[in-house]
A protein has these predicted regions:
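N-terminal hydrophobic/helix-forming segments and targeting peptides
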Residues: 1-432
Length: 432
């Protein structure tokens, strides 16, 4: 048995690779699964009977992944330690009839997903990626990771008051990207193009879940490379850290008093109410089946859940140098200051005093600092999968994350050290 190795700046390098390779939730869970496979995990199908042997397993469902590691000799009532995260990010998603256009321009019809900072998507080179559903019932991932689409902003000469009045965007009229020229709109052009990109025959694709992404790669920023700019940090930063932490704990071979779990859900940005969202039954079903596969009873299930703790890891708000007054006067989380503990007395976050103690112990064991985030009383507080997980499954949950700037922008900003500090905290939590 050995302790897991500590993560360092190399973890941040790897995060940038993960972000680039994961333009959609479907790509993100596929990449997480590939990393877990290399750590000895194996996929199990929800339609198969599960055995109770030790080792690492994972379930894939759409844009969600649940992975867990059963230590040798784990009793059926062994509690779980869960790292929760989400795989989706705000963006523009393709409508069922995507081919459109006007005045000699060919365009793609899109719908707004979640709550993006829409100005950040203007005049940006966009790719297109997602999941294609085929005639034979299978699916295929596709990723056009080159400049394909663009939402052009109106020139200031035609919008003279934009600086004084602020940018006003009509969600239907002003956000449809261009992707070529032509006076004739031909139904099926976009999907035919994607069939070619994916190496499929024409007519094979009968359904799709497609979304835009910025093709600009993540990059270190600043004189001393202290910052990282990139897409989808909310919340692939946590998915990546949770995957790395679970793999490290499983590979260490150390004795574990808990069963470590990674739960990365889809659809957090739209309320989590789906079969792959945190408000669905996926996590509870997987944990229950793990108990029963080891010969457990409902009593064992109740005992296991009663002792379970979940860290809901999602990005939070670092103090903004230009808008510091928007923060609570006495809570100013800084980038590279370590992970943040999120607190809200109205249960927008799930953290309570007991949860704070659990997270503080993990950070102390990992020898890293942590910070506390509380919203300004005059500002509405966002929420996470934390309260949903706590209420739906009756398990103690703590909301944490990494402080970033430009949340929900097409390109967000974090500290270069915070990703590996978070990963080390998660290791200490999963292996107390």
């Amino acid at each position: 048995m050995s302790a897991p190795s500590r993560f360092d700046r190399g973890h941040t390098d790897d995060l940038m690779t993960f972000l680039s390779a994961s333009p959609t939730p479907y790509h993100a869970v596929a990449n997480a699964a590939e990393r877990l496979e290399k750590a000895g995990f194996r996929q199990v199908a929800e339609t198969d009977a599960w055995d109770g042997t030790s080792g690492g397993r994972y379930v894939l469902r759409g844009g969600a992944i649940i992975a867990w590691y059963v230590p040798e000799g784990a009793a059926a009532h062994t509690p779980f330690r869960v790292v929760g995260a989400h795989t989706d990010s705000p963006n523009l998603r393709v409508k069922p009839r995507p081919d459109t256009g006007a005045h000699g321009w060919r365009q793609v019809a899109v719908e707004i997903y979640g709550g993006p900072l829409m100005n950040s998507w203007l005049d940006r080179d966009l790719g297109l990626a997602g999941r294609l559903s085929l005639r034979d019932g299978s699916t295929r991932l596709v990723n056009v990771d080159r400049p394909l689409l663009r939402v052009p902003q109106l020139a200031i000469h035609m919008d003279r008051n934009v600086t004084a009045d602020g940018l006003k965007l009509d969600k239907q009229r002003h956000l449809q990207p261009v992707w070529g020229l032509g006076d004739t709109v031909r139904d099926g052009d976009l999907i035919a193009f994607l069939e070619d990109e994916a190496g499929l025959a024409r007519g094979e694709v009968t359904g799709w879940d497609l979304m835009t992404h910025s093709v600009e790669p993540p990059a270190y920023l600043g004189r001393d490379r202290e910052l990282v700019a990139g897409p989808r940090m909310d919340n692939l930063l946590s998915v990546h850290a949770g995957t790395a932490a679970l793999a490290a704990v499983a590979a260490s071979g150390a004795g574990l008093p808990y069963i470590p779990v990674l739960a990365a859900f889809d659809h957090e940005e739209t309320g989590s109410q789906s079969d792959t969202g945190a408000d669905g039954p996926l996590l509870g079903t997987v944990l229950e089946r793990s108990v029963f596969a080891r010969g457990g009873s409902y009593e064992d299930r109740a005992r296991a859940f009663a002792g379970t703790v979940c860290l809901s890891s999602d990005t939070g708000h670092a103090v903004h140098p230009n808008y510091a007054e928007r923060h609570d006067p006495t809570h100013h989380p800084r980038v590279n200051g370590g992970p943040i503990l999120k607190v809200n007395v109205n249960n927008r976050y799930a953290t309570d005093g007991s949860g704070r103690a659990v997270f503080a112990a993990a950070c102390e064991k990992a020898d890293i600092p942590f910070q506390t985030f509380v919203s300004n009383n005059s500002m509405p507080c966002g929420t996470t999968i934390g309260p949903i997980t706590a209420a739906r499954h009756g398990i103690s949950t703590v909301d944490i994350g990494v402080a970033i700037l430009s949340m929900h922008s097409a390109r967000e900003l974090c500290g270069a050290d915070d990703p590996h500090l978070l990963a080390n905290a998660l290791v200490a939590f999963l292996q107390p």
